[in-house]
């Protein structure tokens, strides 16, 4: 019996025949179980006990004793005693039955074995019946008592109400000396009417309709079903059979009695150990994934053994020879031999088993979460960096003979000197050992362009679904303890065990650099305090939502999962297109499966989500499964923990608006969204009678985030059912076109600001429709198309959905080719009489007929859109021209482009060129010549110009978040951000909105404004690298030199005669410093208007 419960021990005192009762009922059923089996086994009658009846009897006894009712317990104890007594009787006695005849009436024969068995097991049936009868008698008696008590209470309540009504009647009669004829019945009716109105006033929030009692009953029924934990546990148990061994071990740790800190440390060590011994952990089980591993391990082990065999012979004689040869070579000629030696030493020190396990595990992880691409070069370099970190775990005494030959500290020192080519050698050797000896990881030529052909690495389609589920490492798990604070010198070790951080993060760095940037971003105190606060926010899993999701996950016809809740087997006969579709679908299955598995694991634990920062200051959670920056499914499962949020009036309003937003009404005025809520709820309740997903299925075109909609719907229903309920769901409001909001603020262009809801002078903004910049841009594009010289273009009207992606990338230097690619996501290509055409669907044309464009005319369409988006928005054009002029100067002077963000980060934007180089890692005979790209000291001018604007705008976005978190920390609000989206509990959203606005205002409109500060910084940087030049007038050309001065140039930013001379150039090149955009001519007046308009805007976020 595996039932876990409080136990009551009953032992039989055979001498006195008494039952001894203690505090453990499990021992009672244990003793009965063992006694019955002992009786049966000791019997000479071959009694076979019916285990099904025994289990039924024991479960019934446990369930009855759970009630802790003395009267019932006494009855059960006596029944148990009778059962044991009677069973023992059948075992210890020889029994007979009469077989007499007329001649021999007294003849008897002993019972058969069948008869002994039947009577013995019949005792168990009698015991079950007796206990059930006792339970029924008790329940009947208890029910009679309940009825009496309820009737008594009802009489008391009725008398109290009548007494209260009499008092109310007297008060009403005395008001203003009016004579009112009342009786008790009318007063009762009036009181009920008042109560009903008060109740409905709460329920409807800001709506204008009421809910019936049937609605309320239905709401309670929905919530009750969602909160049935036994159903949730059953679904999780079903899911757990598919989990990896790693997740099962983590579950055991989470379910243990360890303190929180020890649990976290145990999980960290378990995951790291699992990665280092991946194969050993998975060799002996029978799951499909592990059968694959079992089959390939011998091949990999043989390959490693053969590689190292020559080096191990005669006490490492070959290594000794290599060391000797290298020591006699000059620095310039020993590099390849040194790298080859390092590769061998790394494998020897780490060991074959750990090298196989860790490299295989990391390759699967890199290919599953391919942020830096899947070229062989990228995978090899990343793998090289990761395997080197494992050396930190190697102790000096682990391999004394090898350490005596080549000390590990000396090896680490040599590794620290390696460039990307050396790191590539290490990673490529390990990758080559796997690709050459198994077909799980395969290579394919991705771009076939002669010498520039590049190998891509991927998981074989046959194995991808079975292997990627295992690719979970420690940084993808939530933390049970609050992440460690960033130290005073900027070191970041969020995990309890420092080695965990070193192995998986960036050597204790908060800011993750970018491979093509020469310089690292310098952090600031504000960044540190912001990250420390964000890391301190505690979360928990939304169990009701998890219950819903698990049920939907098992539904093969789920419209919400769109088929991604089932693995699609990839067949040899599948076409390339079908295989790609299946691989993509299975990838989403793996993502969803991991999210659900981890949510199930952590459902009973509060947790934290540590973050890291990219070079621009943008914040990202380390976990990409349980993450508030994840997709719809992940965000729907997260609640704030440690928050007491009983909805107040502002909370009700924000919850209602967010529900309306998720239902697809986010383009309506704020006030109209509030009126939609009751209708949404009533329609949902009606649909729920058919299916709990029918409402979403019927409104799938409007609801883009169905899981979050369900999550917020349940929160709303809970608040209706229980006004005192704690509603800790994150309410997420996002900025509209935040990149363009930053451009409007930088340039102080009021029209643009108004079109992105940054600014409004409305007297009642809640009644206004939110501005839609996409529609604004679409109208400008349509004006150009209708006046086109090309007949086909005049029939094209496009729509908001088609141009949205292109408009979103306006602040990020959209190209004409980029626009063409974005548009093709909505168009098709057809061949007619050997000519290929782009087909514009009838839904995007005035005539409602398909329009066929040849590629020349399609190019004209793209050109018109590009012209409108880049040239007809004056502020964007002015700002782009200004930055391009500044970048030209920095490039000409060969100095890095630097800026200090409003939150104090110092960013050096130095995109460098890479040169291709052919490399063959000679450690393996099977290694191939591969072209890798190595960094140079030269700046990549084209890349810098193209990518400066998006990275600059993102750094401002990030600063807004840093300033917000800094101010939020003083108010101790629960909060998270998704770059330009902001979340808190419903009651705190208006406070958060104000703080977001204040942070934005502090960036652009306090003191002299950020663009002027940035301009001065640019000028100071330029002046420090040049000689000042003073001119008596305007310079017509570079030869018009009036004189140089050694005095520092005092730059006057609003004048147009500021020049410097390039001190490095052989000819005295004169450089004009560009002016600020035009909006700054009336800066002070514009700033005051902007601040007032921002504070007045209802849709800045929301």
UniProtKB/Swiss-Prot annotation:
GO terms for molecular function: DNA binding; DNA-directed RNA polymerase activity. One of its GO terms (cellular component) is mitochondrial DNA-directed RNA polymerase complex. Gene3D superfamilies: 3.30.70.370, 5' to 3' exonuclease, C-terminal subdomain (1.10.150.20). PROSITE patterns: RNA_POL_PHAGE_1 (PS00900), RNA_POL_PHAGE_2 (PS00489). Keywords: DNA-directed RNA polymerase, Mitochondrion, Nucleotidyltransferase, Plasmid, Transcription, Transferase. It is found in: Mitochondrion. Its EC number is 2.7.7.6. GO terms for biological process: mitochondrial transcription. Coiled coil: none annotated. It catalyses: RNA(n) + a ribonucleoside 5'-triphosphate = RNA(n+1) + diphosphate. The keyword rRNA-binding does not apply. The active site is at residues 734, 804, 980. Its main location: mitochondrion. PANTHER family: DNA-DIRECTED RNA POLYMERASE, MITOCHONDRIAL. DNA-dependent RNA polymerase catalyzes the transcription of DNA into RNA using the four ribonucleoside triphosphates as substrates. Belongs to the phage and mitochondrial RNA polymerase family. This is Probable DNA-directed RNA polymerase. The lineage of its organism: Eukaryota, Fungi, Dikarya, Basidiomycota, Agaricomycotina.
């Amino acid at each position: 019996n595996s039932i876990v419960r409080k136990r009551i021990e009953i032992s039989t005192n055979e001498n006195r025949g008494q039952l001894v009762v203690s505090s453990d009922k499990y021992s009672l059923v244990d003793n009965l179980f063992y006694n019955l089996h002992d009786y049966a086994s000791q019997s000479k009658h071959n009694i076979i006990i019916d285990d099904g009846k025994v289990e039924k009897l024991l479960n019934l006894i446990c369930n009855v004793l759970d009630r802790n009712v003395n009267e019932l317990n006494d009855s059960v104890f006596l029944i148990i005693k009778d059962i044991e007594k009677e069973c023992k009787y059948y075992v210890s006695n020889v029994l007979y039955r009469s077989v007499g005849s007329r001649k021999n009436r007294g003849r008897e024969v002993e019972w058969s074995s069948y008869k002994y068995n039947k009577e013995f097991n019949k005792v168990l049936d009698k015991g079950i019946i007796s206990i059930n009868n006792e339970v029924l008698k008790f329940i009947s008696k208890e029910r009679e008592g309940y009825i009496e008590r309820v009737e008594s209470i009802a009489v008391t309540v009725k008398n109290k109400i009548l007494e209260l009504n009499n008092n109310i009647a007297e008060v009403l009669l005395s008001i203003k000396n009016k004579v009112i004829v009342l009786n008790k019945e009318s007063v009762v009716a009036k009181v009920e009417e008042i109560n009903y109105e008060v109740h409905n006033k709460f329920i409807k929030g800001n709506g204008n309709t009421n809910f019936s009692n049937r609605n309320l009953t239905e709401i309670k029924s929905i919530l009750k079903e969602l909160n049935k934990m036994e159903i949730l546990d059953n679904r999780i148990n079903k899911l757990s059979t598919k989990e990896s061994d790693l997740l099962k071990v983590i579950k055991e740790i989470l379910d243990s009695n360890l303190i929180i800190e020890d649990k976290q440390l145990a999980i960290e060590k378990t995951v790291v150990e699992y990665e280092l011994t991946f194969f050993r952990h998975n060799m002996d089980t029978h799951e499909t994934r592990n059968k694959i591993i079992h089959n390939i391990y011998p091949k990999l082990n043989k390959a490693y053994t053969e590689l190292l065999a020559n080096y191990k012979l005669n006490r490492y004689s070959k290594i000794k020879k290599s060391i000797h040869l290298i020591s006699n070579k000059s620095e310039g000629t020993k590099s390849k031999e040194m790298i080859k030696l390092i590769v061998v030493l790394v494998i020897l020190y780490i060991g074959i088993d750990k090298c196989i396990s860790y490299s295989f595990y990391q390759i699967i992880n890199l290919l599953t979460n391919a942020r830096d691409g899947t070229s062989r070069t990228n995978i090899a370099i990343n793998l090289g960096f990761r395997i080197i970190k494992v050396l930190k775990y190697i102790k000096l005494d682990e391999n004394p003979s090898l350490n005596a030959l080549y000390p590990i500290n000396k090896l680490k020192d040599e590794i620290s000197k390696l460039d990307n080519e050396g790191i590539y050698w290490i990673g490529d050797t390990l990758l080559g050992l796997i690709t050459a000896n198994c077909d799980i990881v395969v290579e394919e030529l991705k771009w076939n362009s002669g010498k520039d052909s590049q190998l891509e690495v991927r998981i074989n389609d046959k194995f991808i679904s079975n292997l990627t589920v295992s690719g979970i490492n420690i940084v993808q798990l939530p933390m049970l303890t609050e992440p460690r604070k960033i130290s005073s010198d900027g070191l970041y070790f969020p995990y309890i065990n420092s080695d965990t951080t070193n192995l998986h993060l960036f050597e204790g760095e908060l800011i993750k650099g970018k491979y093509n940037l020469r310089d690292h971003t310098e952090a600031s105190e504000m960044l540190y305090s912001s990250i420390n606060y964000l890391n301190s926010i505690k979360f928990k899993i939304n169990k009701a939502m998890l219950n819903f999701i698990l049920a939907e996950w098992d539904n093969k016809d789920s419209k919400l999962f769109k088929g991604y809740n089932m693995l699609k087997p990839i067949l040899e006969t599948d076409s390339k297109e079908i295989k790609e579709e299946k691989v993509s679908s299975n990838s989403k299955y793996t993502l969803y499966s991991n999210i659900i598995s981890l949510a199930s694991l952590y459902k009973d634990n509060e947790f934290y989500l540590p973050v890291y920062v990219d070079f621009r200051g943008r914040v990202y959670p380390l976990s990409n499964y349980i993450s508030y920056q994840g997709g719809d499914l992940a965000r729907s499962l997260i609640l704030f923990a440690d928050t007491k949020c009983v909805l107040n009036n502002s909370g009700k309003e924000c919850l209602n608006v967010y529900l309306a937003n998720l239902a697809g009404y986010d383009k309506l005025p704020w006030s109209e969204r509030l009126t939609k809520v009751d209708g949404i709820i009533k329609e949902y309740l009606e649909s729920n009678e058919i299916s709990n997903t029918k409402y979403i299925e019927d409104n799938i075109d409007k609801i883009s985030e169905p899981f979050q909609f369900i999550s917020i719907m349940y929160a709303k229903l809970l608040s209706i059912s229980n006004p005192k309920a704690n509603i800790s769901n994150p309410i997420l409001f996002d900025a509209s076109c935040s990149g363009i909001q930053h451009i409007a603020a930088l340039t102080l262009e009021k029209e643009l600001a108004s079109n992105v809801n940054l600014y409004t002078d409305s007297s009642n903004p809640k009644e206004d429709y939110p501005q839609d910049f996409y529609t604004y841009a679409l109208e400008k594009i349509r004006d150009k198309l209708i006046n086109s010289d090309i007949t086909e273009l005049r029939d094209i009207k496009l729509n908001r959905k088609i141009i949205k992606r292109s408009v979103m990338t306006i602040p990020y230097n959209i190209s004409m080719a980029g626009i063409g690619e974005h548009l093709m996501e909505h168009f098709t290509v057809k061949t007619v009489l050997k000519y290929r055409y782009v087909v514009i669907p009838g839904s995007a044309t005035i005539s409602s007929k398909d329009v066929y464009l040849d590629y020349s005319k399609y190019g004209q369409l793209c050109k018109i859109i590009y012209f409108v988006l880049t040239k007809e928005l004056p502020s964007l054009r002015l700002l782009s021209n200004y930055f391009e002029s500044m970048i030209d100067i920095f490039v000409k002077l060969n100095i890095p482009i630097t800026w200090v963000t409003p939150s104090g980060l110092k960013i050096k934007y130095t995109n460098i060129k890479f040169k291709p180089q052919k490399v063959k890692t000679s450690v393996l005979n099977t290694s191939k010549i591969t072209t890798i790209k190595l960094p140079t000291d030269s700046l990549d001018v084209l890349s810098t110009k193209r990518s400066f604007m998006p990275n600059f705008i993102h750094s401002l976005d990030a600063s807004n978040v840093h300033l917000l978190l800094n101010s939020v920390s003083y108010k101790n609000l629960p909060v998270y951000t998704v770059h330009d989206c902001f979340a808190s509990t419903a009651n705190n959203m208006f406070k958060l909105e104000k703080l977001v606005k204040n942070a934005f205002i502090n960036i652009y409109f306090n003191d002299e404004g950020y663009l002027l500060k940035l301009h001065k910084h640019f000028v100071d940087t330029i002046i420090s690298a040049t000689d000042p030049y003073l001119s008596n007038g305007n310079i017509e050309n570079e030869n018009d030199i009036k004189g140089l001065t050694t005095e520092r140039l005092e730059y006057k930013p609003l004048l147009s005669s500021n020049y410097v001379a390039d001190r490095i150039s052989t000819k005295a090149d004169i450089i004009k410093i560009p002016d600020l955009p035009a909006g700054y001519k009336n800066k002070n007046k514009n700033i005051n208007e902007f601040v007032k308009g921002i504070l007045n805007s209802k849709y800045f976020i929301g």
